[in-house]
Amino acid sequence: GLEALIETTLGMDNVEASATSSDRREAMQFGVADYAASCRARTTNIGGLNPHYPGDQWHDGLSRMLVACRAYGLRPVDGPFGDFNDPEGFRLAAGRAAALGYEGKWAIHPSQIDLANDVFSPPAAEVEKAKRILAALAEAATKGLGAAQLDGRMIDAASARMAENVVAMDDVIQTKSLA
């Protein structure tokens, strides 16, 4: 399949058109360095944050690309983190992308591969909670209920969809690990 690399302001402005440009398209990747240059962002740290910006200056671009990917069935992949001597910086950048719903991140150095696998793999506790959510909702459904309570919180169909995503990702990872 085809993958698109979104790395300019014009590319981001046309991200939806890019997402729908071919039936062979499978994924989109965020090219943060060229995107930063295109935005004239004041940074020289590829994929890192500028300490003078209050938050994550890449959030808007990452979010826009994620929405286009998910709306049209593509896999979103975050771009590089240039300082391969900063594993914590890589982990933080990857964590922000994973929290948004990205499925992976470029590793430009062998030291980043295990970090990426760790960040984008749901922790065992998260998988277990997701399974508990699905079980509680299945039990509620047998009683004709569309919602339930788990650990003092309301869960419903949206909770089930989020939990299914976690379990599905874990299933893929576990299957690949066994291969």
Predicted regions, residues:
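Expand to "…catalyze enediolate/carbanion chemistry for C-C bond making/breaking, isomerization
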Residues: 1-179
